[in-house]
Amino acid sequence: MNYADTARVKSVLKNCWFTPVETVEEADIVIFDTCSVRQKSEDKVTGKLKEIPLDKKVWITGCMIQHNMRNQKIMTGKKLPENLKTGNFWGVVLTKEPRIVGLTSEEVKNLKKSDKGELVGINHSFNPLFHNLSQKWKNIELFFRIDDTGFLPLMLQKLGYEVRYDRELTNEYSTIVPEGINSSMNAHNKTAYIPISTGCNQFCAYCIVPFARGLERWFPVEQIVKEAKIHLANGVKEIVLLGQIVNKHPDFLTIVKEVLKLEGLEWLRYTSPYPTYYSDELLALHETEPKLCPHIHIPFQSGSNAVLKKMFRGYSAEQCYTFIDKIRSLKRPISITTDIILWFPWETEEDFQETLKLTEYARFDMIYMWIYSNRPGTFADRKYPDEIPYKVKHQRRSQLNDLLYRISDENNQLEVWAERTMIVNEIAENWDIFGYTDNMKQIILKSSPKTANLEIWMLLPVRITKWMVFKLEGEPLL
């Protein structure tokens, strides 16, 4: 999602006549698009700020900012100004007296293309996170919510920048289409990340997303397809549809079918789905549509009914097994990857064994193991003390890793001599080729006369010739 958010910020700034650059050294302004899912992600921001020269202005946006703005009352116990309560605020400008700047609901409603608007400064008890960061790094100039990207031109005027912006200002993040801006980290990447929704209503006990991104909002089918067309016209080959619960969109099946029809598309993927919102028709498309990648990433989080219930996941372990059976019944082999939260509070040894059992049954190709991170304001933060000893945590992680290594090794053996397609995302100096296959496995093509003419971001057919744990080796079929 951060890739898609960053593309929208870059697009608005480009239309304000700002020029994107590749390195910090070239930049006048460095923008941090932050994540708040785990505390470690927020801690990384502090580490990265140390690397920015003081002559560079710094802006910070993303979930860390949205979460801290939205939940100031939860975290500090201080009364919020009315403007903050209703969400009618667009940024924190760091002047001598830090203040939130924004537009009232009525001003937003009456805003027209020709109206440059006037930002209203509102004094309030300043957020401790913003205060501490801005006191430590004097080059921080602006904090803003990613939802308010459409009002960046007005914020920049308030900061004294000369802004030329001839497009309609919008308070709807989803309507900003990043024309001519690739949504990947590399400007020449052939993958585009397209959000089809934002926010979440699930309120899992551990998850900060509903607090950081708000309640779920679904974007119109026409808008999503329009954005996909723009990316494909710019040379993109792979599209990834994004949503916190991506397949909960009421028109998700229609979106998938419409994008699959678009000229120039080679691969289509989506993340992250939820097991209880899968339709049999969607699964059937994985079997019949060659452009819909043979890979499903499904974040089960645990194999224990007791833990799933404490997490408020809304499904049982038995439903996980049933869903896996449906995937395995398809005639087209599908790679399955998952997320597992380790060390969730009060997870017993019996609970952990149930997760190992699910892993063995599903034969996951990859598990993204997330160490439980306590997030302020969540139900787990308020109700579930973390009482699992460190030694036990370490043992459980090692056990799950050992099991995953064995399963990955066995799964990858079955790939040998299979023919697949891959995307090239790195070419080494010795001309070894690195990339990933349509079923999301890392692959290496060793340097040979056949690889001499390959280019970065190419899609090409390959034959698997060798397996390793978590990696494959192959040769191009050209």
Predicted region positions:
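Conserved SAM/AdoMet-binding glycine-rich loop
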Residues: 59, 67-70, 232-352, 360-361
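Short acidic, glycine/proline-rich loop/turn micro-motifs
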Residues: 308-311, 379-383
